[in-house]
Amino acid sequence: MGKGDPNKPRGKMSSYAFFVQTCREEHKKKHPDSSVNFAEFSKKCSERWKTMSAKEKSKFEDLAKSDKARYDREMKNYVPPKGDKKGKKKDPNAPKRPPSAFFLFCSEHRPKIKSEHPGLSIGDTAKKLGEMWSEQSAKDKQPYEQKAAKLKEKYEKDIAAYRAKGKSEVGKKGPGRPTGSKKKNEPEDEEEEEEEEDDEDEEEEDEDEE
């Protein structure tokens, strides 16, 4: 989403994100030379956030509101580069990036949270999922990590085949067209098979993402 565009407004931050930022700054002041263990740090922040009163949280909620107003204001004036959307939508048949272990965990647990807390906002649902994930043991996370690793491996194979297919198609349009009539038929068969596989892969990944 416009990662390469330096003029794109910085994304808005939630109240919890401001709180985590404050925690990180406090940690840096207290331990300037020590590195942060992010899993441990996230868990401590989450536990601390849970015990805070509404009054203590209000400071961060005010920061989030003003940041949202800043973001909305900047987005109204923001014009994305013309080539930005074209670059994104140029390859609709390209294999989709595989979901992470955390994303798979969210897909599985989000419906349960929604049914238990129907009024919960998207941001609060995401925060709750983050807290749940940080509370999982390494053993509990393992099935999601294994599935994510398999999907990543599959994606790497698919993207390699997709790129190879793109190169072979460019080659066909090149000057060697009249002499390669026999060779032309062989890659086409392979490409048809690859296209079928790509379609199946996309369906599987769509199901996972849902």
Swiss-Prot record:
Domain of life from the UniProt record: Eukaryota
Biased composition (Basic and acidic residues): 51-76, 162-172
GO BP term, pick one: positive regulation of innate immune response
Cleavable signal peptide: none
Chain positions covered by the region annotation Required for chemotactic activity: 165-180
CDD domains registered for this protein in UniProt: HMG-box_HMGB_rpt1, HMG-box_HMGB_rpt2
Gene Ontology CC: chromatin; condensed chromosome; cytoplasm; extracellular space; nucleus; perinuclear region of cytoplasm; protein-containing complex
DNA-binding residue intervals: 9-79, 95-163
Location of Cysteine sulfonic acid (-SO3H) modifications: 23, 45, 106
Localization in the cell: Nucleus; Chromosome; Cytoplasm; Secreted
Acidic residues bias: start-end ranges: 187-210
Modified residues (Phosphoserine): 35, 100
Residues bearing the modification N6-acetyllysine: 3, 30, 43, 90, 114, 141
GO molecular function: chemoattractant activity; cis-regulatory region sequence-specific DNA binding; damaged DNA binding; DNA binding; DNA binding, bending; DNA-binding transcription factor binding; double-stranded DNA binding; lipid binding
Keywords: Acetylation, Chemotaxis, Chromosome, Cytoplasm, Disulfide bond, DNA recombination, DNA-binding, Immunity, Inflammatory response, Innate immunity, Nucleus, Oxidation, Phosphoprotein, Repeat, Secreted, Transcription, Transcription regulation
UniProt PTM: Reduction/oxidation of cysteine residues Cys-23, Cys-45 and Cys-106 and a possible intramolecular disulfide bond involving Cys-23 and Cys-45 give rise to different redox forms with specific functional activities in various cellular compartments: 1- fully reduced HMGB2 (HMGB2C23hC45hC106h), 2- disulfide HMGB2 (HMGB2C23-C45C106h) and 3- sulfonyl HMGB2 (HMGB2C23soC45soC106so).
Cited Pfam families: HMG_box, HMG_box_2
Primary residence: nucleus
Region called Disordered, residue ranges: 51-102, 162-210
Disulphide linkage map: 23-45
InterPro entries to which the protein is assigned, alphabetical: HMG_box_dom (IPR009071), HMG_box_dom_sf (IPR036910), HMG_boxA_CS (IPR017967), HMGB (IPR050342)
Function: Multifunctional protein with various roles in different cellular compartments. May act in a redox sensitive manner. In the nucleus is an abundant chromatin-associated non-histone protein involved in transcription, chromatin remodeling and V(D)J recombination and probably other processes. Binds DNA with a preference to non-canonical DNA structures such as single-stranded DNA.
Subunit field text: Interacts with POU2F2, POU2F1 and POU3F1. Component of the RAG complex composed of core components RAG1 and RAG2, and associated component HMGB1 or HMGB2. Component of the SET complex, composed of at least ANP32A, APEX1, HMGB2, NME1, SET and TREX1. Directly interacts with SET. Interacts with LEF1.
Domain writeup: Both, HMG box 1 and HMG box 2, show antimicrobial activity.
UniProt family annotation: Belongs to the HMGB family.
Protein name (Swiss-Prot/TrEMBL): High mobility group protein B2
Organism field: Rattus norvegicus
Phylogenetic lineage: Eukaryota, Metazoa, Chordata, Craniata, Vertebrata
UniProt gene name: Hmgb2
